[in-house]
């Protein structure tokens, strides 16, 4: 392969990769039913927290701080699920002091952009799902 042909080929590959990355960045979030806690977890949380909510999702290795094991929330809180605090955290109203700056996306903003009147139902459904998977 000549140097010119190789250069053209490399430029085309680079352009295709850049276009694909831009398309991925602009891909809309999957919509879920407001009452579907497991579906919301799968669509919005599992990439980092993992399908089993153990903090081992495929994106976890790319993060500077390891995602929490969400099956142990109650265990870390004296055996009681802190529902109000979890709901405020999901909605982006509170931060977890141990995390320092907030790395987790604030889903309340996403939920409000979908249908403002369903935010409380969405937050409750996701909180109920997290409560249901406690060990």
Language model regions located:
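Positively charged n-region of N-terminal signal peptides that target proteins for export
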Residues: 1-4
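Bacterial N-terminal signal peptides
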Residues: 7-16
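Electrostatic cytochrome c docking/interface patches
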Residues: 20-40, 78
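Sequence context surrounding c-type heme c attachment/ligation sites in exported
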Residues: 35-43, 116-117, 134-135
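The canonical Cys-X-X-Cys-His
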Residues: 37, 41-51, 104, 126, ...
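Sec-exported extracytoplasmic/periplasmic mature domains
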Residues: 42, 46, 75, 91-95, ...
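Gly/Gly-Pro-rich "capping" loops immediately C-terminal to redox-active cysteine motifs
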Residues: 53-87, 109-116
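Axial heme c-ligation environment in periplasmic c-type cytochrome domains
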Residues: 68, 89-121
């Amino acid at each position: 392969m000549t140097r010119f042909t190789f250069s053209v080929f490399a430029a085309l590959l680079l352009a295709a990769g850049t276009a694909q990355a831009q398309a991925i960045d602009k891909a809309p979030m999957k919509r879920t039913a407001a009452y579907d806690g497991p579906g919301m977890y799968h669509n919005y949380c599992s990439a980092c927290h993992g399908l089993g909510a153990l903090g081992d999702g495929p994106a976890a290795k790319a993060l500077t701080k390891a995602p929490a094991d969400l099956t142990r929330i109650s265990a870390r809180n004296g055996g009681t699920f802190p529902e109000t605090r979890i709901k405020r955290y999901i909605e982006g109203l509170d931060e977890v002091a141990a995390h320092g700056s907030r790395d987790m996306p604030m889903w309340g903003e996403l939920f409000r952009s979908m249908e403002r009147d369903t935010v409380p139902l969405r937050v409750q459904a996701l909180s109920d799902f997290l409560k249901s998977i406690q060990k």
